[in-house]
Amino acid sequence: MTPTYMNIMLAFTISLLGMLTYRSHLVASLLCLEGMMMSLFIMATLIASNTHFPLVNIMPIILLVFAACETAVGLALLISISNTYGLDYVHNLNLLQC
């Protein structure tokens, strides 16, 4: 395994550990989730550049679109929670409440 792949896997692992550690705050969770998505995007781009199969080249773009949608939904949740409660704690997210 090359050092580039090792660094990307290390970035993904650190983001995953940050997600598990700071799961009580929504902002920290969103930042760690974004770090995980960006490391997956870079890994998919490297794999697509190394393989010359034409259908693999669209995979990083699809992953980037999903990351942008995830960011938009996360920021909308953050604004909604901070306007309602004034805090960004995840335990304020009660999906069963109408």
UniProtKB/Swiss-Prot annotation:
<keyword id="KW-0679">Respiratory chain</keyword>
<keyword id="KW-0472">Membrane</keyword>
<keyword id="KW-0812">Transmembrane</keyword>
<feature type="transmembrane region" description="Helical">
    <location>
        <begin position="1"/>
        <end position="21"/>
    </location>
</feature>
<comment type="subunit">
    <text>Core subunit of respiratory chain NADH dehydrogenase (Complex I) which is composed of 45 different subunits.</text>
</comment>
<protein>
    <recommendedName>
        <fullName>NADH-ubiquinone oxidoreductase chain 4L</fullName>
        <ecNumber>7.1.1.2</ecNumber>
    </recommendedName>
</protein>
<keyword id="KW-0496">Mitochondrion</keyword>
<keyword id="KW-0249">Electron transport</keyword>
<dbReference type="GO" id="GO:0008137">
    <property type="term" value="F:NADH dehydrogenase (ubiquinone) activity"/>
</dbReference>
<feature type="transmembrane region" description="Helical">
    <location>
        <begin position="61"/>
        <end position="81"/>
    </location>
</feature>
<keyword id="KW-1133">Transmembrane helix</keyword>
<keyword id="KW-0999">Mitochondrion inner membrane</keyword>
<dbReference type="InterPro" id="IPR039428">
    <property type="entry name" value="NUOK/Mnh_C1-like"/>
</dbReference>
<comment type="similarity">
    <text>Belongs to the complex I subunit 4L family.</text>
</comment>
<keyword id="KW-0830">Ubiquinone</keyword>
<dbReference type="GO" id="GO:0005743">
    <property type="term" value="C:mitochondrial inner membrane"/>
</dbReference>
<keyword id="KW-0520">NAD</keyword>
<dbReference type="GO" id="GO:0045271">
    <property type="term" value="C:respiratory chain complex I"/>
</dbReference>
<keyword id="KW-1278">Translocase</keyword>
<dbReference type="InterPro" id="IPR001133">
    <property type="entry name" value="NADH_UbQ_OxRdtase_chain4L/K"/>
</dbReference>
<feature type="transmembrane region" description="Helical">
    <location>
        <begin position="27"/>
        <end position="47"/>
    </location>
</feature>
<dbReference type="Pfam" id="PF00420">
    <property type="entry name" value="Oxidored_q2"/>
</dbReference>
<comment type="function">
    <text>Core subunit of the mitochondrial membrane respiratory chain NADH dehydrogenase (Complex I) which catalyzes electron transfer from NADH through the respiratory chain, using ubiquinone as an electron acceptor. Part of the enzyme membrane arm which is embedded in the lipid bilayer and involved in proton translocation.</text>
</comment>
<keyword id="KW-0813">Transport</keyword>
<dbReference type="GO" id="GO:0042773">
    <property type="term" value="P:ATP synthesis coupled electron transport"/>
</dbReference>
